[in-house]
Amino acid sequence: MTKTAVITGSTSGIGLAIARTLAKAGANIVLNGFGAPDEIRTVTDEVAGLSSGTVLHHPADMTKPSEIADMMAMVADRFGGADILVNNAGVQFVEKIEDFPVEQWDRIIAVNLSSSFHTIRGAIPPMKKKGWGRIINIASAHGLVASPFKSAYVAAKHGIMGLTKTVALEVAESGVTVNSICPGYVLTPLVEKQIPDQARTRGITEEQVINEVMLKGQPTKKFITVEQVASLALYLAGDDAAQITGTHVSMDGGWTAQ
């Protein structure tokens, strides 16, 4: 039977790479994310060309619970619910705590943490009914450790780790697994945007941000690729990972081993 995968924040970066990989494996794909209409159409058509199943896009804003509920209801009506849920949507803002805008805190917590609560809440009932499901939360090395100037992001990602463990325990006997992937620095549009932001905040050059801030903490001195994260997600979405639940897998070039 063809599985249906819902991937939030999947019009670029890690989410798009996961969508491509699951599409190649034959899954129906529900994309989600912002972009100009032409860009969304191009991405949807590209992913559709990789899958033998159905590929569509839902524009739910991850800061709006009603839109998330509408997306999950659409998936239930169209496909009988999500078999695979990948919570990947994420935003970032870098600033000293005393200057951190309240609206940015609220936005980051909403997108990076609360949206996962809402998608999981909608996904679990159909998964329980089927007796099978995979929930994969894209957390971060910042779900395990902290860095300066990222109070909201670090708080949200630590929250994702707690949410992952709690839900995994609640559904442990239902055939549903819940895990987190904790990447280090992956060269995505989100990370690329951080480079000039951190250069401004720290008063250093962009090259220094890359070499002395980002990759300094990764012993391999290399960015993780989106394809590497996607391959791990594919494994966690499969039957071979049925006994992996309530945990995280770090993919951080050795960052959190230090």
Curated annotation (Swiss-Prot):
Name of the featured protein: D-beta-hydroxybutyrate dehydrogenase
Keywords: NAD, Oxidoreductase, Plasmid
Active site location: 153
Annotated substrate binding sites: 140
Residue sites binding NAD(+) per the record: 6-30
Top-level taxon in the UniProt lineage: Bacteria
Keyword Oxidoreductase recorded: yes
Transmembrane segments: none
GO BP term (any one): monocarboxylic acid metabolic process
Listed GO MF terms: 3-hydroxybutyrate dehydrogenase activity
